[in-house]
Amino acid sequence: MAKRVKRAGRKREKKHVERGIAHIHSTFNNTIVTITDPAGNTISWASAGTIGFKGSRKSTPFAAQMAAESAAKSAMEHGMKTVDVYVKGPGAGREAAIRALQAAGLEVSLIKDVTPIPHNGCRPPKRRRV
C-alpha cells in the first residue's frame, strides 16, 4: 500500500490589524461578509452558504447574522477592534449583519450604503407573476 506523504502546507501568517472595513454584500439570494484592512486586503470572509445554509434559507436575516458573526470572530483573531461598514445590495440581511458585527465585539465607527444605482443602465429582470 502506498504511503501517504504529508504535504508541507503554507501556514497562514497572522496579520495584526486594529482597524478595518466590513463589506456586506446582500443580494436577494445570499449575504457575503468580507472584512478587509484599510488597503483592501482580505482578512476574513463568510457567506450564508459557507456557514451551512442551503437554498432559500441563505436569504434570511438569521443566515446573514451567522455569516457576519463568523467573519467577525475570525477578524478579531487578527487583532481587529474597529470597522467601517460598507453595505451593498437590496437583500434581507443588511441590518442583521451590521447588528451581528456589533454583537460580536467589533466597534462600528461608520455605516455607508454603497449600493450601485444605475442612471438608466441595463434593463432589469422582468416582474415576477405569482
Swiss-Prot record:
GO biological process, one term: translation
Recorded family membership: Belongs to the universal ribosomal protein uS11 family.
Listed PANTHER family: 40S RIBOSOMAL PROTEIN S14/30S RIBOSOMAL PROTEIN S11
Keyword Ribonucleoprotein: yes
Gene3D superfamilies linked: Ribosomal protein S11
Organism: Thermoanaerobacter pseudethanolicus (strain ATCC 33223 / 39E)
GO molecular function: rRNA binding; structural constituent of ribosome
Family matches, as InterPro entries: Ribosomal_uS11 (IPR001971), Ribosomal_uS11_bac-type (IPR019981), Ribosomal_uS11_CS (IPR018102), Ribosomal_uS11_sf (IPR036967)
GO cellular component terms attached to this protein's record: ribonucleoprotein complex; ribosome
Record's function text: Located on the platform of the 30S subunit, it bridges several disparate RNA helices of the 16S rRNA. Forms part of the Shine-Dalgarno cleft in the 70S ribosome.
Superkingdom of the organism of origin: Bacteria
Keywords: Ribonucleoprotein, Ribosomal protein, RNA-binding, rRNA-binding
Protein name: Small ribosomal subunit protein uS11
Quaternary data: Part of the 30S ribosomal subunit. Interacts with proteins S7 and S18. Binds to IF-3.
